[in-house]
């Protein structure tokens, strides 16, 4: 999974990116690597994985990962050539979802580019740049499809749909809020890879005083939540300044620091939870002496397709899936014990994998 972090200058975007990636870097349980200065890979915190690794005394424990991209150049006027237009467009088109950092704190020492704090204005500023970029794509596609629409019924249908999407964007709406009418429209929309069709998570960056109650008394946060609800987007409250402090601590110190603030989870954990929920993701597990590993899949994925995440041969030659819930396995004390109690099941190709399933795939190629 790849998430692109965007935001106007001085909203805390780079602080958040650096804090999240550094937190992953310095935690012994969650290794981190840097691809380049603007890309970081952070492992997904998952207590189940560590418990299973201890259970099997695994030589290796491999968590799921999220790739964060710090999207540069997204400023007012970017669609007209301001900022680093080509760079940000190339980067943002590759991500699965957008994390939009919005400033919800007052601080006279940190000047806002527009002079005052207004997160909804900031959101609209960036959305407008994304809309302009999408309109360019649609206009190029319309020009191409128009050439064959008179002689090709399918092209004519697509042209009608393109005009529908264009009108939606010109009305100030995002592509993600467009209601499609059939599978053809879904397929066409997917091929355009529009920026405004990507799911969005709003990171409401607040002052330290607002973090304990999750921004309940912050009018800016409430405005962002109301806006996001109309897009079926996720909102999580974070204090980038606190995350920066947390990133300097080891695991034990981090837990104590969070407890002192009245928090049960870090910003990274909040973001992971919001991302999985928004994108409809979950994890199944494979476990053994050699390796215990988490695999990220879409909710609703069937066993053969889950097997294909490990290797294409597993999906192609799928026979059965040997399945046990991770908690049942731990409670029984051994795999044999879980089998004796009838908790290990043999599932076929129509089985829908559940979050926390520990699976051994049977296959033959």
What is each model feature region?
Residues 1-111, 139-140:
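Conserved G1/Walker A P-loop phosphate-binding module
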Residues 2-6, 17, 146-352, 359, ...:
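C-terminal-of-GTPase-core extension/linker across diverse P-loop GTPases
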Residues 22-23, 48-49, 72-75, 103-109, ...:
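Conserved nucleotide-binding/hydrolysis micro-motifs of P-loop NTPases
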Residues 23-31, 38-40, 48-51, 80, ...:
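Glycine-rich, flexible loop/turn motifs
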Residues 32, 46-49, 62-68, 82-96, ...:
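Amphipathic alpha-helical transducer elements in NTP-driven molecular machines
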Residues 38, 71-72, 102, 141, ...:
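Fold-independent oxyanion-binding glycine-rich loops
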Residues 42, 74-80, 115-129, 149-154, ...:
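Flexible beta-alpha connector loops of hexameric P-loop NTPases
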Residues 85, 89-191, 202, 236:
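Long, charged N-terminal accessory/stalk domains
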């Amino acid at each position: 999974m790849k998430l692109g972090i965007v935001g106007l200058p001085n909203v805390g975007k780079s602080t958040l990116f650096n804090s999240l990636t550094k937190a992953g870097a310095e935690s012994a349980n969650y290794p981190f690597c840097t691809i380049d200065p603007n890309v970081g890979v952070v492992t997904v915190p998952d207590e189940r994985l560590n418990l299973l690794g201890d259970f099997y005394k695994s030589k290796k424990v491999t968590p799921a990962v999220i790739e964060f991209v710090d999207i540069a150049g997204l400023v007012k006027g970017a669609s007209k050539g301001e900022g680093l237009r080509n760079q940000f467009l190339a980067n943002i088109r590759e991500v699965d979802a957008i994390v939009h950092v919005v400033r919800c704190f007052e601080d006279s020492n940190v000047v806002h580019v527009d002079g005052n704090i207004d997160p909804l204005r900031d959101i609209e500023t960036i959305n407008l740049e994304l809309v302009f970029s999408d309109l360019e794509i649609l206009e190029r596609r319309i020009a191409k499809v128009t050439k064959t629409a008179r002689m090709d019924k399918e092209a004519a249908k697509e042209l009608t749909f393109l005009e529908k999407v264009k009108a939606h964007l010109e009305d100030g709406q995002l592509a993600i809020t467009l209601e499609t009418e059939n599978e053809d429209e879904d397929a066409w929309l997917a091929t355009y890879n529009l920026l405004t069709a990507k799911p969005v998570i709003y990171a409401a960056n607040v002052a330290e005083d607002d973090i304990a109650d999750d921004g309940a008394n912050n009018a800016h946060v409430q405005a962002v939540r109301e806006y996001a609800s109309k897009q079926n987007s996720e909102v999580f409250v974070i204090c980038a300044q606190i995350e920066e402090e947390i990133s300097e601590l080891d695991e034990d110190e981090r837990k104590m620091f969070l407890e002192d603030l009245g928090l049960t989870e870090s910003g990274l954990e909040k973001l992971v939870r919001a991302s999985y929920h928004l994108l409809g993701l979950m994890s199944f597990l494979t476990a053994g002496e050699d390796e215990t590993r988490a695999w990220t899949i879409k909710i609703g994925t069937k066993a053969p397709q889950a097997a294909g995440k490990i290797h294409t041969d597993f999906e192609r030659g799928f026979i059965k899936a040997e399945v046990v819930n991770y908690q049942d396995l731990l409670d029984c004390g051994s795999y044999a014990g879980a089998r004796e109690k009838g908790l290990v099941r043999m599932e076929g190709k129509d089985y829908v994998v559940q979050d926390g399933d520990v699976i051994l795939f049977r296959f033959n190629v």
